[in-house]
Amino acid sequence: MNSLSIFFIVVATAAVCLLFIQGYSIYENYGNIKEFNATHAAFEYSKSIGGTPALDRRVQDVNDTISDVKQKWRCVVYPGNGFVSASIFGFQTEVGLNNTRSIRKFNTMQQCIDFTFSDVINIDIYNPCVAPNINNAECQFLKSVL
C-alpha cells in the first residue's frame, strides 16, 4: 500500500467515526431535541436559510398555497374607516340588498385578521381596478397597499 491509499483509508475511517459519534449524540439527546422542537414550533413559519418559505402546516389559511406576494391576503388600514382585507384580486366585500357590494370594513386589526384567515369558504371579492372604474380612489388605494 502506498501513502495515498493509507491517507484515503484514514480519511474514510475518520468520516465513519464522525457519523457514529453524531448518531450516538442524537440518540443520547433525543428527548432534549424533541423538547427544543416543541418549544420553537412557532418559528416554523419563518423563512429558512435556503430562501424557500416554510409553511406552517398546523393551521390552514388562505395564503398557504399562494407564492406571489401581491396575491396574499393582508389586513391594511383603510383611510378613516378602520381596516380592510386586500390583495391584488381586490377587497373582501359584503353583499347587501339588491346584490349591492361594499368593501367589508373592520373596527380593529384583530377582527380583520380573524375574518380574513378563518374557514370562510365563500368570500365575495370586489376589485375596483376593473374597467370602467380604473382611476377611482378605491383602485388607487388598492394599488398603493400592494
Curated annotation (Swiss-Prot):
InterPro entries: Poxvirus_A28. Pfam families: Pox_A28. Residues 22-146 are virion surface. It comes from the Viruses. Its main location: virion. Keywords: Disulfide bond, Fusion of virus membrane with host membrane, Late protein, Membrane, Phosphoprotein, Signal-anchor, Transmembrane, Transmembrane helix, Viral envelope protein, Viral penetration into host cytoplasm, Virion, Virus entry into host cell. The chain crosses the membrane at residues 1-21. GO terms for biological process: membrane fusion involved in viral entry into host cell; symbiont entry into host cell. It is found in: Virion membrane. It is a single-pass type III membrane protein. Signal peptide: none annotated. This is Envelope protein OPG155. It comes from Ectromelia virus (strain Moscow). The gene is OPG155.
